[in-house]
Amino acid sequence: MLADEQPKGSPARGRSAVRSGAFTGLSYVTLSLAAAVAGAFLAHKFGRNRETDGFMAAYGVYLVLVLGAQAFRMVVVPDLTRAEAEGRLGSEFRAYALAFVAVAVPASVIAWVFSDFLGELITGRLPEDSAHVAAQALPWLVPAAFAQLIAALAASALAAKDSYVPAALGFALGGIGGVVFFVLFADSHGLVALAWGLTLNGAIAIGLPMVVLLVRGNRLRRHRGVPLRLRYRLWRLLYGAAVPLALQGLYVIALRFAAGTGEGNVTSLSYAYLLAATFVSATAFSLALISAAPLTRRGVDAEGAAEHVVHSAWISLAFVGAAAGLVALVGGRVVTAVLGDAFSGNVGDELGRLVVYLSPWMVANAAFLITYPLMFVMHRTRLLIPLALAGMIVDIPISIVCRSLWGLTGVTLALGVTTLLVVLGLMAALAPRMLFVTAVGLGRLSLLVGAATALAFGGASLVLSAVPAAAAGLALYAVLLVAMRQFGLAQAWQYVRALH
């Protein structure tokens, strides 16, 4: 389907699509900033010791469950959109919610009753102090993580009604409320205050979208035609999260290989990855969320899917290029100011370079976030688990070769290569003819954005110091994008505006 054949939509609805994407993206940025503030405060307040090791071990459990919640938003929106069209959205929402509560309640009770045992289990050979802190945090972090899953479900139900702002506000206010709580109570209660703050975060994230759902008349009574099907719904969550969890596993593998390249490189790669992930998710993840419902209603074929991926990636990577250029020039200074002198000098500069080396991963991850919901819109889910397993397996030899050739730089490149292979597999699973069209389109726009970023920020850095070069580079980058708009950016913007 050609771009000029797409339904253009009214100007008001075009503004609605842009507003929805902007609010969703700003919500994700707010959450990321809140997490950064919490991390910086934790580092300055508590340092790096046995207690923080124990808390971070428990926090890893929370992260895995929250990642599943984020993936579930991409999975369930098509289901709820079809339910809305058939007049059974409230019933479908209730069935999913009951299924998740049926797991959340016993899991939370187990985390509370057996907290000491679980604290020792997840901290392994760490000292007893670490296990004690983990045991304090787990009874709060487990229900907090399930709260994020229910919040994702409520946000998806609103998305089925083309309503994105309430959920975006709920997630953003939850992130802010959680970090404020942590800062206020850290002195008197220690690290467990962060676990309490995350629980408050989840409560706020659930509360606002739930109130909006109820006010808009979605009764949560059970519909006779909507069975609970607990195992089916939990299985849908598990296989829907398989590929996102596998891609997170690639990052864990990258950290393991980075550990063999020198002291401190794991930390540097971690921060570079978090920055790169924030840039991509704030744009590509937001576009994926606001497009799933309209694409489900409209229907999409292989050509339409390819067009959707390329156009959405154009918008995402245009912003990512600017962010990456800024980090390359001034990221080290910002990190030093936030995290302290341990990241000053060459360490900070290296972090900026790592973000640049993660450019292939950013392109691949943007394509993944945009493509993945299409698997559920088009009912092409049979190969998700095999693709997830294959990605984990092939990443190890790729990482071995790349690290032996280029060290830490090779580790970042291997992460991008394997992620790209998984994305290409997803595209082939959607439709073989989509693979070629999308690969060509993504390759073309990657070259355009990469050239504009290198010319603008690299050129400015040759004649100016870091901060003035960043400002001048950003201005020149914007000019170059305007000059290149006829190479696809203008059509991509028009496409996104017509989504709603």
Describe these PLM feature segments.
Residues 2-17, 192, 210-247, 264, ...:
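Interhelical loop/hinge segments that connect adjacent transmembrane helices in multipass membrane
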Residues 2-5, 461-500:
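Membrane-proximal transmembrane or re-entrant/amphipathic helices at the cytosolic face
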Residues 19-43, 201, 205, 209-213, ...:
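Transmembrane helical elements of multi-pass membrane transporters/channels
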Residues 42-63, 132-135, 258-278, 347-352:
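Interfacial/gating helices of multi-pass transporter permease domains
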Residues 70-85, 283-303, 372:
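Helix-loop junctions and terminal segments of transmembrane helices
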Residues 117-139, 330-363:
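Interfacial segments at transmembrane-helix termini and the short loops linking adjacent helices
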Residues 147-169, 360-387:
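Membrane-interface junctions at transmembrane-helix termini in multi-pass inner-membrane proteins
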Residues 170-184, 188-216, 390-395, 408-430:
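Hydrophobic alpha-helical transmembrane segments
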